[in-house]
């Protein structure tokens, strides 16, 4: 969940900066100078949409370290850190890519993998997770994060986000142009779009951005199932991954802990559409039914 939220927030911030810069440079005025040029608008939307998404990808590892306060283990300071590095080294070797950076951060049970490529990736685990699980369960979580890197999930998410960004920007500006023309009526101005265009384009971008996040989260949930299966394959057995999920979800107590509920690791109803992870019960069922 953490890597998805960080990526989406960074993507939103980058898109906002690029959009404001484009407006200050008069790009919108150019696009609407002789009526709305749909081809140019689509090209502009794709440039900003994919550009913002790939800039977010390039910044993902730095942003993750900064926002979580993660401490990269350069030299193991104790046996636990040595075990962490050795385990990630073995898992990444099995997965067929260079060993990623390994980091630890303070907080409730959590873990994430991020980075722009397999050779420039990061795996981080929280102190809360290390304290609440045995080593076999921690290894399963590490295998899950290594599987995310192996499957290229950050790049896949970047491409999906780029497509989503493109359509959000395109539709928002096209509809804003219609709204602006309606508000201005027969008024003819050579100075470009009016205030109605600026206000409505921002409103439409926010609205479509929220709706588009449902698409991104849908693909994220699918990738979680693949990462669970990948973890089982890397470890050669499914039981440890199932046990780790049970600890994370607190299934023994019959309820999710507050930390995981707030992270959207499981949910129902409309909120499930905005969750980056499937319900833990569904993930366990998928692992148990796998052949």
From Swiss-Prot:
Keywords carried by this UniProt record: Cell inner membrane, Cell membrane, Hydrolase, Membrane, Metal-binding, Metalloprotease, Protease, Transmembrane, Transmembrane helix, Zinc
Its membrane topology: Multi-pass membrane protein
Domain of life assignment: Bacteria
Cofactor note: Binds 1 zinc ion per subunit.
Chain positions recorded as Zn(2+) binding sites: 144, 148, 224
UniProt record, GO biological process: proteolysis
EC number(s) on file: 3.4.24.-
Pfam family name, one: Peptidase_M48
KW Cell inner membrane (keyword) present: yes
Co-factor requirement: Zn(2+)
Family according to the record: Belongs to the peptidase M48B family.
Protein name, entry field: Protease HtpX homolog
Source organism: Prosthecochloris aestuarii (strain DSM 271 / SK 413)
């Amino acid at each position: 969940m953490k890597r998805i939220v960080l990526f989406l927030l960074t993507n939103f911030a980058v898109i906002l900066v690029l959009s404001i810069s484009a407006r200050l440079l008069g790009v919108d005025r150019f696009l609407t100078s002789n009526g709305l040029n749909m081809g140019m608008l689509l090209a502009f939307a794709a440039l900003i949409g994919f550009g913002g998404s790939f800039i977010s990808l390039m910044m993902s590892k730095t942003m993750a370290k900064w926002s979580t306060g993660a401490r990269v283990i350069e030299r193991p300071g104790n046996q636990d850190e040595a075990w962490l590095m050795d385990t990630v080294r073995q898992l990444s070797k099995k997965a067929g890519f260079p060993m990623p950076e390994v980091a630890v951060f303070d907080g409730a049970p959590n873990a994430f993998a991020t980075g722009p490529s397999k050779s420039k990736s990061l795996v981080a685990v929280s102190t809360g997770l290390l304290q609440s699980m045995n080593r076999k369960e921690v290894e399963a979580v590490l295998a899950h994060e290594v599987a995310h890197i192996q499957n290229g999930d950050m790049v896949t998410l970047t491409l999906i986000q780029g497509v989503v960004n493109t359509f959000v920007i395109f539709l928002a500006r096209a509809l804003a142009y219609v709204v602006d023309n309606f508000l201005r009526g027969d008024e003819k101005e050579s100075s470009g779009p009016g205030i109605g265009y600026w206000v409505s384009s921002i409103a439409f971008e926010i609205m479509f951005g929220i709706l588009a996040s449902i698409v991104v989260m849908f693909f994220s949930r699918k990738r979680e199932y693949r990462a669970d299966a990948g973890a089982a394959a890397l470890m050669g057995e499914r039981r440890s991954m199932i046990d780790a999920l049970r600890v994370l979800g607190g299934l023994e107590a019959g309820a999710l802990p507050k930390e995981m509920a707030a992270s959207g690791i499981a949910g129902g109803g409309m909120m499930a559409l905005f969750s980056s992870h499937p319900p833990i019960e569904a993930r366990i069922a998928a692992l148990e039914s796998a052949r």
